[in-house]
């Protein structure tokens, strides 16, 4: 299983949250990364959707030490069917593999994408999550 995970919100190392602290213990921070997408405010957390050229979301890339175990907890936290990347229509997020950019080039990583209606949500520009805003 691919051990790479792109995070862009609550799981960022700079965010004081129990899950970001847990992730720091279960993974190695590879570094900063970007994703071609759009970021929206979904209540107290962000939602990421696929974007087009020019749409950039800034985040971090992690290498999970035990991806299978970590994804059980992460999928539950993100509202994805436990232990699987499959989702039902009621779930807000889906875990999918996408290409992300790092300072050394592109790589494929797991990303949690928002599945809800973004037309009623506030877009987070310039694609950097700040929980204080």
Report the location of each language-model feature.
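Glycine-aromatic micro-motifs
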Residues: 1-133
């Amino acid at each position: 299983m691919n051990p790479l995970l792109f995070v862009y919100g609550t799981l960022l190392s700079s965010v004081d949250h129990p899950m970001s602290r847990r992730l720091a213990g279960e993974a190695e921070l590879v570094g900063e990364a970007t994703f071609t997408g759009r970021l929206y405010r979904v209540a107290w957390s962000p939602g990421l959707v696929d974007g087009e050229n020019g749409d950039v979301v800034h985040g971090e890339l992690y290498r999970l030490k035990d991806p299978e175990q970590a994804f059980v907890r992460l999928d539950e936290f993100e509202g994805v069917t436990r232990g699987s990347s499959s989702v039902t229509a009621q779930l807000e997020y889906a875990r999918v593999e996408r290409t992300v950019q790092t300072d050394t080039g592109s790589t494929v990583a797991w990303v949690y994408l928002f599945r809800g209606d973004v037309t009623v949500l506030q877009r987070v520009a310039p694609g950097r999550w700040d929980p204080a805003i």
